[in-house]
A protein has these predicted regions:
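Bacterial N-terminal signal peptides that target proteins for export
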Residues: 2-16
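Short, conserved catalytic-motif segment at the N-terminal edge
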Residues: 35-95, 115-117, 124, 177-178
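Peripheral terminal and inter-domain segments
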Residues: 382-726
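Short, glycine/proline-biased beta-turn/loop segments that scaffold the active-site neighborhood
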Residues: 118-132, 223
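Catalytic cores of secreted or luminal carbohydrate-active enzymes
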Residues: 352-402
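Boundary at the C-terminal end of the N-terminal hydrophobic targeting segment
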Residues: 30-34
Length: 726
């Protein structure tokens, strides 16, 4: 019965969306064609130049569309600092998760062709897909596109490499086969990269074509998107904007999750996709999608799921982050938005179908999709003024806390305690010097660190710090307690709120087995040699800690941020259920016995104990790669020179005692200098192969630090490794 009610409600919503799309196409064209946007462009250019200067980014590019016109296209900064070359309209940027829009279009193309049904089980098309939770059979194609599959989140192992890794899709399938669902399929929408990676498997199974080939044939070619490509092979120098750390160019970034985040494109090319969507599926005389499919993409997919605090910031459509773009919704204008963030690139893609406007921006770090979306809000609001649809651009709201009101003991007690999300463990405590105030502390490898203090209840019902417009309140839903965050968003003219963290209650104290693992470290062994896991600042170390003051939890990860509940001596289980983004990217720790050692699987990455790493002795050392072909780690007790023989090894990396990369190479024989005691050598090679490492200690070299010191060092802060956020 519930299914039939949901189906009728969804059909009614899509029918309404279809009417809106068709009316927008008919009504908006004349106004868009007649408008002079000189004022919009003048203001937007000044804002873009200010954003470039404030962010310190090397470059970015944008496009503004009205109706069928590409009204404004401009680039800023330098695509190549070494040659002072500016980007041009054809310079490609990684667009991160904006790639999901292509995956959605590809899927809806198959729906229009009658090859795929959105609400059919995914296993109908990809029978090789499986998970440990039997409910995986309930996952539909739609759930892959609206983030409601219940998947843990993202397979980060081998996600970012220097060269394309064609085995990533199979690796995701293999990883899902040994994972559990975090929620019942369809129960709540939580941002999920792996769902879109599964679209690659869907396209391959249904069409016999690779995903990249299908998108090229069915989307890029019909739309004339000639400067859009997946990084399957190297790009010619000068065709893409380089990302930098300081003034040092980064290797070209390759995200192996093609459908979820791997595309390189330009704002000009993406503006063609935007015009197709604004036109209800047609562009340049070619119909790519039916109007019904475009309307389905733009319909709110979260209205029937568990979503106790709807947020315009995250109101998922099919592919879209929000089908009520908050900056436009604040002035009564409909909009769809998708953002993309990876390690090196950022993008924002906004379409206002009723107003017949669109804005696309792409850039390099340290920009963000949020800053580019905010720029887009500014441009589109000014464009609405130029159209006559708005009298004036809305003024930013005052950035100040509302007046204080007295909090009851119950209101204070509801806020206090421990809270968690996928990347945060938070403690809220009464302020020592004010019984009406609260302090926030975040758990780090160095213990509790204060993040906010003196928060008091205000007249809006939330706790704010003095001078802050951001406020916090509690709510109970689905049998769980949440801390909600309210804030002023985007261009500063609207308020929004979302569920931030979930209450953590005391659990059964940790067993002796888990207690023995606290404070220890493990090292990754099964990534591709050019994986970003092994690069500077990568999550090469896995550490385990507890939550001081709260029994029954371990915090796990490269930076000890995700709380887990051990359910037995070998499994640290995920448990968070926060709609939106708060429980995205969950992973479980599975302890596996390797001889006398405990190794840990975290997602698709396998870690070996750091404390039992073999040491290289002076003279010749034979290193043999095991039957699994895992990488081999060795410690260096003293400073000295290492010579790695020809044969056996294929790649090497040298790390200092704090796991910073000192060097890497793939040419042999290799001569490597370890400048101090306590360095680490990482070797890659074929299963069963052997190589010889000859160590010549430096004169007067001192012995390295012992294992206990190494474990202590593992708990110190390390460079942040930025994973693709959306």
């Amino acid at each position: 019965m519930r299914h039939h009610i949901a189906t009728r409600a969804r059909r009614a919503l899509v029918a309404l969306a279809l009417v809106i799309v068709l009316l927008a196409v008919m009504a908006g064209t004349a106004a868009a064609r007649a408008t002079d946007y000189a004022a919009t462009i003048k203001d937007g250019r000044a804002a873009a130049q200010a954003l470039l200067a404030q962010s310190g980014a090397a470059s970015f590019s944008l496009a503004f569309v009205s109706g069928e016109r590409l009204v404004w296209q401009e680039t800023f900064g330098e695509a190549d600092k070494a040659t002072s070359t500016p980007p041009d309209a054809d310079t490609m940027y990684g667009i991160g998760s904006v790639s999901k829009m292509l995956a959605t279009v590809a899927t809806m193309k198959l729906v229009d062709q009658g090859e795929v049904e959105l609400d059919a089980p995914f296993t109908r098309y990809v029978p090789a897909f499986s998970m440990l939770s039997p409910a995986y059979r309930q996952i539909t194609v739609r759930m892959m596109l609206d983030h409601s599959s219940g998947f843990p989140g993202s397979t980060y192992g081998d996600l970012v490499t220097d060269t394309y890794f064609p085995g990533y899709l199979q690796q995701v399938l293999d990883t899902l086969a040994m994972e559990r669902l975090k929620t019942t399929p369809g129960y709540m929408s939580v941002y999920c990269n792996d769902g879109f990676t599964m679209i690659e498997a869907l396209v391959l199974a249904v069409t016999g074509k690779s995903y990249a080939a299908f998108v090229q044939d069915e989307v890029f070619t019909p739309l004339g998107m000639e400067h859009s490509a997946y990084p399957l092979t190297p790009f010619p120098d000068g065709t893409y904007a380089k990302a930098y750390r300081g003034d040092v160019a980064r290797p070209r970034e390759v995200l192996n999750m093609l459908a979820s985040g791997g595309l390189y494109s330009t704002p000009s090319d993406m503006s063609r996709l935007a015009r197709m969507l604004m036109n209800g599926g047609a562009y340049g005389g070619t119909r790519l999608l039916s109007a019904a499919s475009v309307a389905e993409m733009g319909a709110d997919q979260t209205f029937l799921s568990f979503n106790p605090l709807p947020s315009n910031m995250l109101r998922y459509g099919l592919g879209w982050d929000s089908v009520t773009e908050p900056g436009l919704a604040a002035v009564g204008v409909g909009g769809w938005v998708k953002g993309g963030d990876s390690v090196d690139y950022h993008a924002s893609f906004t379409v206002a179908p009723q107003a017949r406007l669109a804005f696309v921006a792409t850039g390099v770090a340290p920009l963000s999709s949020t800053s580019l979306q905010t720029l887009g809000q500014r441009v589109l609001l000014h464009a609405l003024v130029d159209q006559g649809a708005l009298r004036r651009v809305p003024r930013p709201l005052p950035v100040a806390a509302p007046p204080v009101k007295r909090a009851s003991a119950a209101q204070l007690a509801a806020m206090e305690g421990y809270w968690g999300s996928f990347n945060t463990v938070l403690r809220v405590s009464a302020s020592a010097d004010d019984p009406q105030a609260l302090d926030f502390f975040q758990l780090t490898a160095n213990g509790w660190v204060p993040t906010a203090s003196g928060l008091r209840l205000r007249t809006d019902g939330r706790f704010h710090a003095d001078g802050s417009a951001s406020g916090y309140s509690t709510m109970t839903a689905g049998g769980r307690r949440y801390l909600a965050a309210g804030f002023i968003g985007g261009y500063g003219h609207y308020r929004d709120a979302l569920l931030w963290v979930q209450k953590l209650a005391p659990e059964t104290p940790l067993s002796a087995a888990w207690q023995s693992r606290l404070g220890k470290a493990w090292l990754a062994v099964n990534e591709q040699p050019d994986s970003a896991v092994y690069a500077e600042g990568g999550p090469v170390l896995l550490t385990l800690g507890d939550v001081p003051g709260l029994p029954g939890y371990v915090v796990s990860g490269p930076y000890e941020t995700q709380p887990l509940i051990p359910v037995d001596d070998t499994l640290g289980a995920m448990f968070l259920q926060i709609p939106g983004v708060g429980s995205r990217d969950l992973e479980e720790d599975l302890v596996e016995q390797h001889g006398s050692e405990e190794w840990i699987w975290r997602g698709s990455t396998l870690y070996r104990p750091q404390a039992t790493m073999p040491a290289l002795a002076a003279g010749a050392n034979t290193v043999t790669f095991g039957a699994e072909g895992y990488a081999e780690w060795r410690s260096l007790p003293a400073a000295g020179t290492l010579t790695i023989a020809v044969g056996g090894a294929t790649t090497w990396r040298l790390y200092d005692p704090d796991m910073a990369v000192l060097g890497a190479g793939a040419t042999f024989p290799a001569t490597v200098t370890a400048p101090q005691a306590g360095c680490y050598l990482l070797l890659f090679g074929p299963a069963g192969a052997s190589t010889t490492v000859t160590v010549a200690p430096a004169a007067g070299a001192q012995p390295g630090r012992d294992a206990a010191t190494a474990e202590k060092r593992a708990a110190t802060p390390r460079p942040t490794y930025v994973v693709p956020l959306r």
